[in-house]
């Protein structure tokens, strides 16, 4: 089931052992650390789960003590009242982690996601060029989508950091929790942590509009109120960037429309068609030579795109992306075929990520 990592000394104290695990995460560039009773620790490295050997199975007491040592009393009270908790945790110069705590079978389960201290550049992530041009736009809505763990937060952070280096803008982020930490360069940036600095995305978004923002980052558009307010913010002359757990461009447009009641949907289609600037849908694949690489579906708003959204024809967007590759649009299958043709990923891995394997197969044969 798992790969194996031999490393940690079993006799260490609980907190010392945890810090050693975090160091191991950094060394292996693991994306996640899983601690769950009654298993030994498990790291996810390049998308593969790997068991850390030489540590005895974690006990319920171990987990209680560890959680109590890394949360505030208020956070612990919240967890006891509602046994799910998400927060960020800094370990001085060692690491910054996004932590998710829950109970399973009566015991605490923890997942730690590693957040790199330095924000990666757009170039280093291999992001499409639209990430640079879109983030410099004065207004509109930019969406970064993909499944959990596909790097959406990192893409958004790279875009905001590029803006921070190139333009003077007032930026307000609303995150759950705050992941990457920005320092002011050319931009003035405020970061609000859901549950600590604000009660909800919707409330924070409404109040952000009163703070003279140029750019608003909404960590995730989770509900109808947040989506509606984000669209209105884009309509009133702000640049809004957010994320959704959708796998491609057409599904993204449909998901936004479908959260509204039927009597509202045509109006939302009209509004969305007017404010949307770009949708970047991404997924991660294992590289043949080790590590992972992103594949990106890219839609850039133009008159044809806006017309299809307005006329309830999101299913035709892939056709528009295919014929407008000269301006930077591309379908996911096109991105996957390029990765296979370049020898970066295997055909088998690409097929598993494609929503239309037969179409991808034809592209590869062509």
Predicted regions and their residues:
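Short, flexible helix-loop junctions that flank or precede catalytic/ligand sites
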Residues: 2-366
């Amino acid at each position: 089931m798992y790969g194996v990592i031999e490393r940690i000394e079993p006799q260490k104290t609980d907190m010392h052992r945890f810090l050693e695990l975090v160091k191991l995460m950094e060394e292996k560039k693991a994306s996640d650390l899983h601690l769950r009773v009654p298993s030994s620790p498990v790291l996810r490295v390049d998308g593969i789960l790997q068991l850390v050997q030489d540590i005895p199975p974690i006990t319920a007491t171990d987990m209680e003590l560890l959680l109590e040592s890394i949360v505030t009393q208020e956070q612990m009270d919240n967890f006891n009242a509602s046994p799910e908790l998400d927060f960020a945790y800094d370990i001085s110069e060692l690491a910054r982690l996004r932590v998710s705590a829950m109970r399973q079978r009566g015991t605490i389960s923890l997942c730690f996601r590693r957040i790199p201290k330095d924000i990666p550049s757009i170039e280093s992530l291999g992001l499409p060029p639209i990430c640079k041009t879109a983030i410099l736009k004065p207004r509109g809505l930019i969406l970064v989508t993909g499944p959990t763990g596909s790097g959406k937060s990192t893409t958004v952070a790279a875009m905001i950091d590029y803006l921070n280096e190139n333009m003077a803008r007032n930026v307000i982020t609303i995150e759950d929790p705050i992941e990457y930490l920005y320092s002011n360069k050319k931009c003035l940036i405020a970061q609000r942590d859901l549950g600590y600095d604000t009660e909800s995305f919707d409330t924070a978004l409404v109040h952000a509009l009163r703070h003279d923002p140029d750019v608003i980052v909404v960590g995730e558009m989770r509900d109808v109120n947040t989506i509606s307010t984000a669209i209105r913010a884009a309509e009133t002359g702000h640049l809004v960037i957010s994320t959704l757990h959708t796998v491609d461009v057409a599904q993204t447009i449909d998901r936004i429309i479908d959260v509204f009641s039927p009597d509202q949907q045509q109006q939302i289609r009209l509004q969305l068609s007017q404010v949307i600037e770009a949708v970047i849908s991404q997924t991660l694949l294992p590289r043949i030579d080790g590590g992972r690489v992103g594949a990106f579906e890219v839609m850039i708003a133009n008159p044809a795109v806006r017309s299809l959204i307005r006329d309830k024809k999101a299913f035709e967007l892939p056709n528009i992306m295919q014929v407008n590759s000269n301006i930077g649009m591309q379908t996911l299958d096109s991105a996957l075929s390029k990765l296979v043709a370049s020898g970066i990923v295997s055909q088998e891995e690409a097929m598993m990520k494609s929503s239309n394997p037969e179409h991808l197969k034809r592209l590869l044969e062509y």
